[in-house]
Amino acid sequence: MTHASVVDVLTGKYAVGTTQTVKGWIRTRRDSKAGISFLAISDGSCFHPVQAVVPNTLANYENEVLRLTTACSVEVTGVVAASQGSGQAFELQATEVKVVGWVEDPDTYPMAAKRHSIEYLREQGHLRARTNMVGAVTRVRNCLSQAIHRFFHEQGYLWIAAPLITASDTEGAGEMFRVSTLDMENLPRTPAGKVDYDKDFFGKETFLTVSGQLNVETYACALSKVYTFGPTFRAENSNTSRHLAEFWMVEPEVAFADLEDNAALAEAMLKYVFNAVLAERRDDLEFFAQHVDKDAIGRLERFVASDFAQIDYTDAIEVLKNCGKKFEFPVSWGIDLSSEHERYLAEEHFKSPVVVKNYPKDIKAFYMRLNDDGKTVAAMDVLAPGIGEIIGGSQREERLDVLDARLAEMGLNKEDYWWYRDLRRYGTVPHSGFGLGFERLVVYVTGMGNVRDVIPFPRTPRTAEF
């Protein structure tokens, strides 16, 4: 590619007086009475478009330039100049405008240059990336993704490709999508009348993964510091602003690490990626602060400047009981904290991110390490002001006998987890890890409010368009 990106022109990479070519799409066209048109051209490389000043002396000015509308694609060659306007430092004084693609009917173009509702944009999933808002979300999402990989790379972690197809239920909740090539109209049956999965592609019942954690643990128990970052799937019939059927998870696993190490890793990672987005995507964050959530930048700046508080679940319950606030969901020891409880702790009690740890075993997964009291497990949730839970993790149960007892307690067949149990039989080691729902992270950074609006093609109950 030999043409210049918009961001490079706007940030002064090219000297004034040099000739450059920009390729992109028209955001707006403005014509002056002096016979000059001003084209705002975007290529997605940054929030702001570059202005091309087009004189009426160009051969195609009358028959093409004056017909350009929002979303027409163009190649504009011109001389880089200091901008006379206040909106940007540099512009292009156009010497040539080539129209690459026209918009067939500007009057019916679904993404015309006006404010659209969030609901409308979801219906136009194939076109919504053309809007300022979704473009900004996409650049922020990319920045966060790259920062996560960079953080773990710099810390000496290895990225592991966890499988998307699995025979294991990590969470033990049973809310999984089945993967099968069997003919649904003519299912093979066993003598007992059950579906015969021996005849299926994998010779057994298989599912889309709900988490890469168990698989990644196998590598942590050999290579010490690993992580996975990829799509996961939950067949929860939840139509909420916090749930997707397909979403991305960041899941590190660390050998020889306890719950305190885990909490420290979570804090370091979150602060690293928030500092990255503050430094690298300021233009997009300013858009969110102006049009979506006025506290978008301030929230992140306060977060990275805060020391994380820590509190035991049992003590958190006492805080909630005695705070004088009436909650929709009553507080008692043994409940799973709801969003209102989490946000009270982070926003009103601590006024900072907080790690709640040592939860009742009955509300947590089988793989979490049983504490000495026999009632709680070494689990943690990181709660952030403005959203509540942003990370969930634990120290893993490394003792085979205790793991087997927990599997039995939860009605899970230990033979289904034979390979996971092998890790405890051959050089077992304390280890810890956590899961970060990536879309919730993007929601927190942008203030968008709904996970459906921060992933390109959201998958939710009864919705799988595009």
UniProtKB/Swiss-Prot annotation:
HAMAP family the UniProt entry points to: Asn_tRNA_synth (MF_00534)
Statement: the UniProt record of this protein carries the keyword Protein biosynthesis: yes
UniProt entry keywords in alphabetical sequence: Aminoacyl-tRNA synthetase, ATP-binding, Cytoplasm, Ligase, Nucleotide-binding, Protein biosynthesis
Entry annotated with the keyword Membrane: no
Catalytic activity: tRNA(Asn) + L-asparagine + ATP = L-asparaginyl-tRNA(Asn) + AMP + diphosphate + H(+)
Positions of disulphide bridges: none
GO biological process: asparaginyl-tRNA aminoacylation
Coiled coil start-end: none
Location of the protein in the cell: Cytoplasm
EC number: 6.1.1.22
Gene responsible for this protein: asnS
GO cellular component: cytoplasm
Subunit structure: Homodimer.
The family this protein is said to belong to: Belongs to the class-II aminoacyl-tRNA synthetase family.
Major subcellular site: cytoplasm
Protein name: Asparagine--tRNA ligase
InterPro entries: Aa-tRNA-synt_II (IPR004364), aa-tRNA-synth_II (IPR006195), aa-tRNA-synth_II/BPL/LPL (IPR045864), Asn-tRNA-ligase (IPR004522), Asp/Asn-tRNA-synth_IIb (IPR002312), NA-bd_OB-fold (IPR012340), NA-bd_OB_tRNA (IPR004365)
GO molecular function ontology, one term from the record: asparagine-tRNA ligase activity
